[in-house]
Amino acid sequence: MSDSINEKVRCLIIGSGPAGYTAAIYASRANLSPVLYEGIQPGGQLTTTTEVENFPGYPEGITGPELMEDLKQQALRFGADIRFGIATETDLSAAPYKITIDGEKVIEAETVIIATGATAKYLGIPDENKYAGMGVSACATCDGFFYRKKVVAVVGGGDTA
């Protein structure tokens, strides 16, 4: 990591899923001037979800991309600085913390919130991606409702399925 600091911020948020945008909303309301880097998939995993029926405030449901856009707009309304970029290196050994963005820009931050989310593990079988969200699911808790009273196959091991 370079010793050259390109920018100093009070609050740096890495990730733009529900946790990242929620952190940006609260940090903005607390006048922490948050800078949020969206990462490799702006909006996070929910952008690949067709229908979200279990999020409070949306009694008729909402698509994942629409929900994430609503959260992003709310964070922007409160003053969050949302940028595209990927955190490629971190030095969290001592405050202020140093985060390298896109292998080039070094940001020094008083506070770092890491909200990088999760990535589903798939089997890698033919047509699996083709049917993601249309029969192939990576979240039994999230999507089980859609398959009630239907014959399903659940694949997993240990405490995950």
Where do the protein language model's features map onto the residues?
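A generic local structural motif
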Residues: 1, 21-22, 85, 98-102, ...
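Rossmann-like dinucleotide/flavin-binding elements
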Residues: 5-8, 13-39, 132, 138-161
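Short hydrophobic core segments
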Residues: 12-14, 106-119
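N-terminal glycine-rich anion-binding loops that anchor highly charged ligand groups
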Residues: 36-48
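Short amphipathic alpha-helical segments
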Residues: 24-25, 48, 124-127
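Glycine-rich beta-alpha-beta "Rossmann" dinucleotide-binding loop(s) and their flanking helix/strand
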Residues: 112, 116-139
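N-terminal Rossmann-like dinucleotide/flavin-binding domain of flavoprotein oxidoreductases
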Residues: 2-3, 47-106
